[in-house]
């Protein structure tokens, strides 16, 4: 059993209604801590897609309340819909309109789930905020460090790179050393009905996967057609709006050519989608912005060999990083990588430790 310390603490648990956060609440409650469950109502799905029972709404809120009742802990539902729309949904929509491939789960963790929820937890007098994320917090020589979860199949460190050092000191991740199977066994041991509840797979505010309908409802007339141009300079056809395309896309281009073509660049200013052969996707280096750095400071002229992830589903790749001012870095792969997409995150690792990360810009070569 994972113990967060012998001293009884007041701990807020972010309860989503799923098995992970429910198991965390049960574990901490059994250890004798004063546990307070908080569930965030983030989105009225009927506003955009007419779906119910998706993450952080409907059935999930009910499930979280039932778990809290079984454990005998206080439970509160906080209406964060306006915060969520401003910080996550609007950012998601605007990112697509800028020709990027957004990552809303990171934005949600950065703003609503950590910044705003930590503030609420402190106002409640809590000593810590615990979540069901599969990452580890390890106390190093210079303070708290963020490390990958021990189960590589469930590791969520990529989505938490924006966590600040100050936030990391306050946060607890009791599941970081467990597998999903072990978590489900714990939930069963505690008699929680959510023990076998399936994991949510979709973006919470787009449960049917149709992100275009959300964009069009929030930003009407955003799918303006434009040119599809080959990277060699000649026009191949017309696209149906840049929101329908992402870097590396091959299917659904609606053009015929004598070899397979991929989306290699999106120009939102001139409303152009550039396509080319697979080799045109190869990238040697790129710039990241809004860097959140969790390790020792890098000197201005220093180059550091690290591993980086540019998609949550891709393995880390060896690279060299260097500072460009206060909040930018240059990332140079040791071997070229395909389909580096603006708007996605680049997370930087040294072994299992998360050193930091930033957002991929259009400055790609």
Swiss-Prot record:
Positions marked as site (Interaction with tRNA): 133, 344
Highest rank taxon of the organism: Bacteria
Protein name: tRNA-specific 2-thiouridylase MnmA
Intrachain S-S bonds: 108-204
A Gene Ontology biological process term: tRNA wobble position uridine thiolation
Gene name of the record: mnmA
Species name: Rickettsia rickettsii (strain Sheila Smith)
Active site (catalytic residues): 108 (nucleophile), 204 (cysteine persulfide intermediate)
PANTHER family for the chain: MITOCHONDRIAL TRNA-SPECIFIC 2-THIOURIDYLASE 1 (PTHR11933:SF5), TRNA 5-METHYLAMINOMETHYL-2-THIOURIDYLATE -METHYLTRANSFERASE (PTHR11933)
Family annotation (InterPro entries): MnmA-like, MnmA-like_C, MnmA-like_central, MnmA-like_central_sf, Rossmann-like_a/b/a_fold
Keyword Transferase: yes
Binding site for ATP: 14-21, 40, 132
HAMAP family, per the entry: tRNA_thiouridyl_MnmA
């Amino acid at each position: 059993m994972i113990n967060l310390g012998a001293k009884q603490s007041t701990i807020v648990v972010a309860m989503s209604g799923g098995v992970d956060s429910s198991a965390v609440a049960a574990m901490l409650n059994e250890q004798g801590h004063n546990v307070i469950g908080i569930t965030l109502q983030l989105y009225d799905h009927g506003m955009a897609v007419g779906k119910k029972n998706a993450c952080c709404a409907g059935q999930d809120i009910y499930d979280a309340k039932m778990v809290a009742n079984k454990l005998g802990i206080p439970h509160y539902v906080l209406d964060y819909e306006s915060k969520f729309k401003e910080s996550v949904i609007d950012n998601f929509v605007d990112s697509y309109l800028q020709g990027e491939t957004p990552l809303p789960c990171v934005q949600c963790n950065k703003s609503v789930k950590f910044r705003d929820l930590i503030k609420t937890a402190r106002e409640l007098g809590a000593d810590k905020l615990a979540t069901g994320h599969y990452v580890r917090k390890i106390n190093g020589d210079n303070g708290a460090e963020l490390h990958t979860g021990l189960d590589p199949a469930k590791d969520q460190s990529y989505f938490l790179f924006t966590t600040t050092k100050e936030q990391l000191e306050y946060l607890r991740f009791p599941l970081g050393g467990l597998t999903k199977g072990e978590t489900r066994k714990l939930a069963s041991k505690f008699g929680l009905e959510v023990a076998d509840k399936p994991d949510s797979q979709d973006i919470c505010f787009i449960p049917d996967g149709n992100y275009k309908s959300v964009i069009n409802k929030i930003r009407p007339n955003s799918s303006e057609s434009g040119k599809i141009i080959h990277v060699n300079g000649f026009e191949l056809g017309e696209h149906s709006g840049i929101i329908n395309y992402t870097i590396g896309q091959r299917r659904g281009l609606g053009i015929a050519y004598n070899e397979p073509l991929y989306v290699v660049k999106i120009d939102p200013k001139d409303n152009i989608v550039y396509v080319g052969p697979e080799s045109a996707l190869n990238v040697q280096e790129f710039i990241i912005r809004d860097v959140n750095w969790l390790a020792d400071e890098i000197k201005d002229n220093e180059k550091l060999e690290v591993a980086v992830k540019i998609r949550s589903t891709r393995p880390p790749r060896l690279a060299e990083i260097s500072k460009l001012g206060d909040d930018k870095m240059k990332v140079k792969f040791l071997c070229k990588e395909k389909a580096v997409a603006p708007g996605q995150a680049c997370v930087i690792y040294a072994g299992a430790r998360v050193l930091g990360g930033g957002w991929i810009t259009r400055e790609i070569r």
